[in-house]
Amino acid sequence: MHLEGKYLLKAPQAQVWDFVSKPEEIAKCLPDLQSFEMKDSRSFTVTVKVGISFVRGNFKFDFTLLDQKPPSHSRFEAIGKGAGVSIRLSASMDLKITEDDGTELEWQADAEMGGLLAEISPSLIQGSTSRFTQQFFDCVKSKLESSG
């Protein structure tokens, strides 16, 4: 499954980069976050509560930062497991300065899902994923624009 999106933020690129390059800050915006643990400077683990159709429970995701080019590009991967499901995610994010000195955050992600998720309608998964990402980016936007 491929996902992508753009968000306009009323915050300078340096401020956005400072926020999105800190896993402990990003984790605070994950909907239904249960736990967060930094493993080292390039990897961390989160546990989130998930509920899509009959797939419900806590999912553990191990994130690894693969490539960072401050202040404009980051790429990472995550491997998640829980409730008879496996997910492999690779994602990237690019930050661009806008004409009004704000920042455009453009992201894309590809997810491979196995186990019980294969039994669920793709449109149901897409809908749940869209709600999750909207909540996440609304939180990021709120934190950045209220701290500026």
Q: Model segments located where?
A:
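Beta-strand/loop substructures that line and gate deep hydrophobic ligand-binding cavities in soluble
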Residues: G80-G127
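Hydrophobic ligand-binding cavity/cleft-lining segments
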Residues: M1-K49, G148
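Short strand-connecting beta-turns/loops that link adjacent beta-strands
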Residues: P12, S41, P70-P71, T98-G102
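Hydrophobic residues in beta-strands and at strand termini
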Residues: L9, V48, A78, L95-I97
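Glycine-rich portal/gate segments that line the openings of hydrophobic small-molecule binding cavities
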Residues: E37-I79, Q135
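A conserved amphipathic terminal alpha-helix motif
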Residues: G114-G148
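Intrinsic-disorder/low-complexity, polar/charged segments enriched in Ser/Thr/Lys/Arg/Asp/Glu/Gln
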Residues: H2-K6, S43-T45, N58-K60, H73, ...
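Hydrophobic/aromatic beta-strand elements that line small-molecule binding cavities or substrate pockets
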Residues: G5, Q34, K60-D67, L89-I97
